[in-house]
C-alpha cells in the first residue's frame, strides 16, 4: 500500500517512509503418515525459540504445538543440543495424514500463537511488534498536518529480503 500525503510545501527531494506489515512464520512442507506437519521457516526466526511454541495453522487457524523427538527417545548427544528445524514438527492432534489434510494443506502459513503483554515499568511485548508500531506511526503521520509532502509505504516481504520496500522505492 502506497499513500501520498500532500503537505504545506513540496520538499526539495522526495521523501518516502516505509514500514513492513509482514511477520516471521512457517510454511507447511510435508505431512507425515502419523499426521504431523513438517515445516520450514519464513523470515529470520531465531531457531532457539521455536521448540515448544504454540502456533496457529492455515486459514482455519488450527491450534498446534511445535515439537520433536520425545526426550526418552533421544541419545545423550541429542539431549545436549537443540533439535534442528528439520527434526521438528507441528502436532495439531491429528492421528493420520488423512485427518491432518482435512484441516490443513501443503503450503499453508503457520503463525506464532502469542498475545500482547505488558510487563515491568511500561514495557510491552507481542509478536511482530515492530511491524505494528511502524504501521501506527505512519498512520499517525498520514493523519497529521505535514510541513512537507511525503509518500508512505506499507510493504511486505521485509522478512525475506526487504523486497516490498525495494520495489516501492522505484
Residue ranges and their predicted role:
Residues 1-170:
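N-terminal hydrophobic/helix-forming segments and targeting peptides
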